[in-house]
Structures are given as structure tokens and as C-alpha cells.
């Protein structure tokens, strides 16, 4: 059926038959029905295969009639779906739609691409802060912000069409001046669907630390404005209002900004010149010019011919000539050039480039900011999986920095990531992120030396993607009750809903059979109206922006098809019925507090990932873990030391709750402790036996004061964890003076981080860490010299020494002379911890 849909997709791209959209909608409905049947059958099979016992046999016999009834129901549904599938294939024949599997040429990142994808290096990914043609504008805006003679509150407006580079210029200048020249700084995205309360709340959270969210939730808009005004009147502040659409948007928030003649500044970006002239304050208007011919060609070449594409090719002259034509046809609009270059970098076929020159309706580019033709081309060039991944990113609010760890877990839970030979689903998902970045469909917001951390979508691409997602029935974005309940004639029925604000409607009643529910700004969710009823087929549920305590209703236990449950912000109380979620793959509360963790949660047989920021109560001695867990971490944070004392005593007796035999499949583990002042955790917590760690661990981070005491952990870790790739030990986890990496230990370790330890001597025995590539030492101030054995590590590529002024740097010099990358920094500002996904 996927093969037939590709032919339908291609024909709809050519605009051959709009009636095909109804057929596509029917196929999607059937596909969701099939998924529900398969899930239901799997759940039934698991229930029927529980370990035998006398009580289990009695229970099984008593439930046998119910079991037969459910089997019969599944059979009936299969018959109904089969009939619908047969009817669809009849429609395929009617419209002369054929399978395209044999002649599929559209780019697809399958297993044949795995080796090539692994060769892609992150520095080659699009870095939108590295701008071309904007040096003059950047310097002018910077000079206006820092003009010492102008003490008035001044609004500096950047005006230009969508995709012209307004936000890029503003971001560049903001990064240059914010910290060094202003007391308070905040960046706020306005967007078309902004709420006054939401913007004011973001300003408060941006300029005031440790703000009480509950107090803020009880305040009126005018009270918040007065609060901001009172706070800023003693500060020299910089506020960026990005993407302001209407004059009244400014009117609603301007009262929050006092003019106390101290050189405070507001930067405003807009497509509407009337908005730039509207503020009742001193105004400086900067019209953003489009790129000239030389700049357009330079930007296009940078995006269309990255080093990993052109390496070894000798036929680029013809491409460059066509590239000049294409770059100039974009009329100097940077976003159009970037997306075009990203698209063509994946299509280095001369016939494709010539087709682009001849067939695209370039007249549309003459309209301000209209790059629909280029976006259509880039989108249709994606595989079906990448299309879904891109549209999914557009569901996040405008200017939202999307954590890659969250994004990949959502993609996997949605079923967008295929199984690729030799790669895990997580690895494939990360390559999808890289692929979309290389195509310039997403922006890299933050990255480390080894991975992308957060991404964004340009507002023009997001608007385009949201519109397409609605038309295709991929998702429905809603900011009001009317949008939830209304079906539009040009939209297919959606199975995914995104709520951006408080919506007084029972979503499950308005949209039965819903597949995905994403809720942003959840602090404004009216929980007395919101209900889980009717959401029994939900697979993905995510709350973002909760600020208060919320006891989830017991009805959540009915959502047996749920694969992903995510929470960000706030404190959650989980009902015991959560253990009924027998299809759950990921429980993600890495940015939330769980007040009490049900003891049966970790016994769910399908559960693979558990990430929790803080657990306030957990009966660890009663908890059993199933064997399929792949990643698990919790910031250890109980409220009373007595609870921990009891837990540790029992942990020594029954270590399976965290490190024992039932936990041996875990491949990555983070053990993090925090200070007693902040979390109430006693710093005398210790690990009873390192040999209880899972032997197949790939990544390990230990960052808990005194956890290892003064017993050197390296001999045990080096011999027991034979597959370990990444290791970080920090924050005085080990308190001894000597650290010894044993002979032939750590055979597969390639990244080692030692942070804030009191070691005075480090011994590296022969044969230890032969594959080490990256070594980072930070704030180990008592260490005077590096081990001589580092010179003999042939695979060592990079050494970082941070905040260690007393270290003898002779060995650093020798390593640098031998061609290794050596970085020495006096401040730990840029130190990066190991990331456990």
C-alpha cells in the first residue's frame, strides 16, 4: 500500500487529480485501524502468556469467555478492514495508480545510506548564525544598541520580508552584546497567535530568576505588567520582540517597558513597515536589504556544495554554472537560497538541475517572501518517513528550541523511524535530524562537539509546514475550542492534535480515535474541563509548560495503546492505574518532578526508556524491573535522609532495583546526585558494589558527591565494563588521591571526562584505553601532571584541559606537536558534560 501511495503522492505533486486526496485520507484511516488491531492483538497475546501459577491458572480460566469474546471482536475488525482494503485497491485501479516500488528514485535514508550518513561530520551542517551579506546591518544595529550618547529608551526595528534574515541579524547582535552591556536581557517570539499573558509570562521568566509560577498564575495581565515595569526600572535592559505582526501587538505590552534614560533598548523584527513606525518611543528603523548577485551565489555555493558532497568529484563546473542561474532566480532572499541549496545538495544530477531552471514558476519568487515553489520541491524530494519527521517538528510553537532527545523519542513512538540494518532506532533518528539540517529545513540552535542538542524551524518554513500538515490530515494545530471542533473543507481528518493554549473542550469527544495529543503552555490547561475520556486509542501524550502540581486522573490507565508519555515542568502524581499501560515504550519526565513513582511502572514489559528529573517518593525496595529497559536515569532527590538510609540498606540486600541481574540489558546509565541544600539528599550516599553495574553498559556518567568514596573505581570499571564507550566521573564522586587505569582496561572507551575531582596522581598502565579519542579534564586542580602513557594512545585525537592552572603543560605541548588537537581554557564556561539521551 505504501508503494501505491507513492504514486498517488507524485501525481498529487503534479496536480493531476485533487480527488486523490480523499483516497489518501481513506488509506490513512485504514492504516490507523490496522495499527489499533495489531496493538490490541499484541496486548491480548501478552496477557495470555504470563508465567503459569495456580492463581494464574484459575484467573485465566475465569477470564476465558472474555478472552474468546475479545478474539472474536478482533476477527470481526480484521474482516471489516480487509473489505475496506479491497475497496481501496479497486479505487487504485480506477484511477490507474500503480506501485512505484520498483522504480523509486526519491531519496530515502535506508541501510544503503548508513555508511555515507556516518561519514557526515557535524561541522558541515548548516549553521545559520554564520551569515553572508549582513555584516553592515549587524554593525549598524550593534552601534545603535551601544550608542552611549543616546540615553532614551529606543526601539530598533528590523523590517523585511519573511526569510530575509531579520531574526538572524537580531540573534547575532543579541549574542554579541547581551551579556556584556545590559543588566537584563530577554528574547521573546511574538508570532501571529500570541497571547498577551503568554508573552508577559515569558518576559517575567526571562528577566527574573526563581519566579513563583503559582503566584504568576493568579495575577492579571495588568498586575504582571506592573511587576515587569517595577523590576526593569532599575536596570539597563535589552528586549527582543521577534516577529511582530500587528501594531496592536506592541500596544498590549509596551507599558511593561519603562524609560528611565539609562540606554535601554528594544529590538523589534517585523514584516510590516507600519509596525516599525508605530511605537511611541524613539525609533530607529533598519530596512533589511536582500542579497546582491555575488552574495547570493556565495551563499548558494556554500549550501549546495558542502565538502562531503563535492569531495572527489570532477564534474562541478556545469553544476556551478546552473547554480548561478538558480541563485539569482531566488531574488536575493536568503531563506529561498538556503533551502534551494540544501535541496540540490542531495540531487547532484545535471538533469535535475536543468529541470529546476526550466520548470519552476520563478515569477512567484517576485512576490514578497513567497518561496512556496522551492519548499514544495524540497518537501516532495523527501522520503515518506522524512516528510513525517519534518511536519512533526512544525507542531512545536514558533521559535521553540526543540531538544533532539525529545524529538527522536517522539518520532520513534509515532513509528516514523524504520528499522535499518546495523543501527538502532535512536541512531537512525539522529541521522534523520542531521539529514533535515543538511537540507536546511531545520536550524541547529545548539550543539556540542559530538551531537546536535536542540533545533528550530524558521517561522516561514513552520507556517508552510503547518498548512501542509493540516491539508494532508497529518496534524491539526488548535488555539481555541472552535478550531478543535471545526472541520474545514480543504483539510483531511487529522489523528494528531496540538493545543497551544487553554481549550475548553473535551478533546476525546470532539475528535474520537485520536492518535497523538501534544499540549503546550499546559499551565493554562483547565483541568476541570480537560478529560482523558475518549482518548482510549492515544499513542503519544505530551504535556509541556505545566507549572503546578497535577494529579493525573485514573482514566489514563485505559489508554492501553499509549507508547509515549512525556511531561515537562510541574509536579505530577501518577495513579496506580498507570501500570495498565502495557504498550508503553517511553516514560519521559526528564524536566518534571514525579511526586510518587508507582512501584509497578517499571514492571511494564514493553518499557524501554525511563527518564525522570526528580522523584520525591519511591519505594525502591518494593520495585522490580523488567529486562527490556535500554536507558534509565533519575536525579536522585528524596526529601528525607531517613528514606534514603532505609533504601540503601535494602539496596545492598536487593540490588536488582537498580543494578542487579534484572537490569543487565541497560546500555546507558546516569547516576546523578545533588547538594543537600537544594534537594535534601545526604551527600554520604554511596554505591555498594561497582560489580553490580550492567556489564554491557555503553555510556556511564557518575556525578554524585562521595558516591564512590575513596576507593578507586577505574580497576573495576575497566575490567567489568568491557563494552564501555563513554565515561564521565565528576563532582567529587571519587574522593581518593590516586586514579589508576589498569593494564588492558577500557578496551572500547573512546571518550573520557574527569570533572571536579581531587586526584593528585593519575596512572595509565600499558594497554589501557587503546581506542581513546577524546579526553577532557576539567577542574581537577590538584593534578599536577598528565600520565606519560597518553603519548602512546595512537587513536587520541583531542585533549581538553579546562580550569587547571597548576597543570604541567609539557605533555600538552608534545601532543600538540604530534598533531593532536589540544585545547586549554582557563574558564569552565564552555565545559560540556557527557549527554545520556
Where are these regions (language model features)?
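Non-catalytic, charged helical/coil tracts that couple and regulate nucleotide-powered enzyme cores
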Residues: 2-3, 7-15, 203, 207-218, ...
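Mid-core helix/loop region of P-loop NTP-binding domains shared across ATPases and GTPases
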Residues: 198-202, 213-240, 245, 318-332, ...
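Regulatory and partner-binding modules of innate immune sensors/adaptors
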Residues: 55-162, 168-172, 198, 357, ...
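Extended, amphipathic alpha-helical segments that serve as helical scaffolds
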Residues: 1-51
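Cross-kingdom leucine-rich repeat
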Residues: 229-231, 237, 261, 478-495, ...
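N-terminal flanking helix/linker immediately upstream of nucleotide/cofactor-binding cores
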Residues: 84-164, 168-177, 189-191, 202, ...
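A conserved switch/coupling segment of P-loop NTPase cores
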Residues: 175-181, 222-293
Amino acid at each position: 500500500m505504501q508503494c501505491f501511495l507513492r504514486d498517488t503522492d507524485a501525481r498529487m505533486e503534479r496536480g493531476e487529480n485533487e480527488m486523490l486526496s480523499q483516497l489518501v485520507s481513506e488509506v490513512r484511516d485504514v492504516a490507523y485501524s490496522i495499527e489499533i488491531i495489531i496493538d490490541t492483538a499484541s496486548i491480548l497475546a501478552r496477557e495470555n502468556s504470563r508465567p503459569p501459577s495456580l492463581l494464574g491458572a484459575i484467573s485465566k480460566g475465569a477470564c476465558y469467555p472474555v478472552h474468546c469474546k475479545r478474539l472474536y471482536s478482533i476477527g470481526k475488525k480484521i474482516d471489516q478492514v480487509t473489505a475496506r482494503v479491497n475497496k481501496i485497491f479497486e479505487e487504485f485501479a480506477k484511477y490507474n495508480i500503480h506501485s512505484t516500488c520498483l522504480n523509486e528514485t526519491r531519496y530515502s535514508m535506508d541501510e544503503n545510506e548508513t555508511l555515507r550518513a556516518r561519514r557526515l561530520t557535524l561541522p558541515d551542517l548548516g549553521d545559520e548564525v554564520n551569515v553572508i551579506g549582513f555584516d553592515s546591518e549587524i554593525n549598524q544595529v550593534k552601534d545603535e544598541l551601544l550608542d552611549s550618547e543616546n540615553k532614551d529608551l529606543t526601539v530598533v526595528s528590523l523590517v523585511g520580508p519573511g526569510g530575509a534574515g531579520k531574526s538572524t541579524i537580531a540573534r547575532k547582535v543579541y549574542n554579541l552584546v547581551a551579556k556584556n552591556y545590559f543588566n537584563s536581557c530577554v528574547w521573546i517570539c511574538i508570532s501571529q497567535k500570541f497571547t498577551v499573558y503568554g508573552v508577559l509570562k515569558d518576559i517575567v521568566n526571562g528577566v527574573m530568576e526563581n519566579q513563583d509560577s503559582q503566584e504568576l498564575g493568579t495575577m492579571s495581565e495588568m498586575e504582571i505588567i506592573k511587576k515587569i515595569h517595577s523590576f526593569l526600572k532599575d536596570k539597563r535592559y535589552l528586549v527582543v520582540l521577534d516577529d511582530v505582526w500587528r501594531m496592536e501587538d506592541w500596544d498590549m505590552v509596551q507599558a511593561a517597558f519603562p524609560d528611565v534614560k539609562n540606554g535601554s533598548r528594544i529590538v523589534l523584527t517585523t514584516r510590516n513597515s507600519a509596525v516599525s513606525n508605530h511605537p511611541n518611543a524613539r525609533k530607529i528603523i533598519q530596512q533589511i536589504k536582500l542579497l546582491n548577485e555575488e552574495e547570493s551565489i556565495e551563499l548558494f555555493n556554500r549550501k549546495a556544495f558542502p565538502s562531503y558532497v563535492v569531495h572527489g568529484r570532477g564534474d562541478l563546473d556545469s553544476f556551478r554554472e546552473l547554480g548561478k542561474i538558480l541563485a539569482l532566480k531566488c531574488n536575493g532572499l536568503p531563506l529561498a537560497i538556503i533551502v534551494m541549496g540544501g535541496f540540490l545538495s542531495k540531487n547532484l544530477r545535471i538533469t535535475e538541475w536543468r529541470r529546476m531552471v526550466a520548470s519552476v514558476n520563478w515569477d512567484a519568487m517576485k512576490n514578497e517572501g513567497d518561496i512556496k515553489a522551492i519548499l514544495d520541491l524540497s518537501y516532495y524530494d523527501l522520503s515518506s518517513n522524512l516528510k513525517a519527521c519534518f511536519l512533526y517538528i512544525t507542531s512545536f510553537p514558533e521559535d521553540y528550541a526543540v531538544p533532539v532527545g525529545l524529538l527522536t523519542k517522539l518520532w520513534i513512538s509515532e513509528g516514523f523511524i524504520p528499522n535499518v540494518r546495523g543501527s538502532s532506532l535512536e541512531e537512525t533518528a539522529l541521522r534523520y535530524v542531521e539529514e533535515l539540517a543538511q537540507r536546511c529545513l531545520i536550524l541547529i540552535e545548539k550543539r556540542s562537539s559530538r551531537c546536535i542538542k536542540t533545533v528550530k524551524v524558521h517561522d516561514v518554513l513552520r507556517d508552510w509546514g503547518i498548512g501542509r500538515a493540516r491539508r494532508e490530515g497529518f496534524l491539526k494545530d488548535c488555539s481555541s475550542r472552535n478550531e478543535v471542533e471545526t472541520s474545514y473543507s480543504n483539510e483531511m481528518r487529522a489523528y494528531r492534535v496540538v493545543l497551544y493554549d487553554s481549550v475548553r473542550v473535551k478533546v476525546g469527544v470532539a475528535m474520537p480515535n485520536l492518535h497523538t495529543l501534544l499540549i503546550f503552555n499546559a499551565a493554562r490547561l483547565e483541568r476541570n474541563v480537560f478529560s482523558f475520556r475518549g482518548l482510549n486509542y492515544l499513542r503519544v501524550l505530551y504535556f509541556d509548560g505545566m507549572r503546578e502540581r497535577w494529579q493525573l486522573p485514573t482514566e489514563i490507565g485505559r489508554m492501553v495503546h499509549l507508547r509515549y508519555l512525556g511531561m515537562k515542568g510541574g509536579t505530577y502524581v501518577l495513579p496506580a492505574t498507570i501500570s495498565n499501560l502495557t504498550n508503553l515504550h517511553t516514560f519521559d519526565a526528564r524536566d518534571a518532578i514525579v511526586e510518587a513513582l508507582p512501584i509497578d511502572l517499571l514492571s511494564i514489559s514493553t518499557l524501554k526508556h525511563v527518564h525522570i528529573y526528580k522523584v520525591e517518593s519511591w519505594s525502591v525496595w518494593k520495585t522490580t524491573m523488567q529486562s527490556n529497559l535500554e536507558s534509565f536515569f533519575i536525579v536522585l532527590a528524596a526529601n528525607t535522609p531517613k528514606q534514603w538510609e532505609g533504601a540503601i540498606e535494602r539496596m545492598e540486600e536487593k540490588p536488582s532495583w537498580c543494578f542487579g541481574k534484572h537490569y543487565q540489558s541497560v546500555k546507558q546509565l546516569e547516576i546523578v546526585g545533588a547538594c543537600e541544600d537544594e534537594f535534601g539528599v545526604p551527600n554520604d550516599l554511596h554505591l555498594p558494589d561497582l560489580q553490580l553495574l550492567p556489564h554491557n553498559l555503553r555510556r556511564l556518567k557518575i556525578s554524585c558527591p562521595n558516591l564512590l568514596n575513596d576507593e578507586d573505581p577505574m580497576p573495576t570499571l575497566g575490567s567489568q565494563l568491557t563494552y564501555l564507550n563513554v565515561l564521565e566521573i565528576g563532582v567529587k564522586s571519587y574522593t581518593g588521591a590516586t586514579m589508576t587505569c589498569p593494564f588492558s582496561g577500557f578496551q572500547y572507551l573512546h571518550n573520557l571526562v574527569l570533572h571536579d575531582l581531587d586526584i593528585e596522581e593519575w596512572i595509565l598502565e600499558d594497554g589501557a584505553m587503546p581506542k581513546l579519542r577524546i579526553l577532557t579534564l576539567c577542574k581537577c586542580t590538584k593534578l599536577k601532571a598528565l600520565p606519560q602513557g597518553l603519548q602512546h594512545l595512537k587513536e587520541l585525537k583531542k585533549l581538553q584541559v579546562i580550569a587547571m592552572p597548576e597543570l604541567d603543560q609539557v605533555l600538552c605541548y608534545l601532543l600538540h606537536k604530534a598533531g593532536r588537537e589540544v585545547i586549554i581554557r582557563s574558564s569552565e564556561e564552555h565545559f560540556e558534560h557527557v549527554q545520556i539521551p
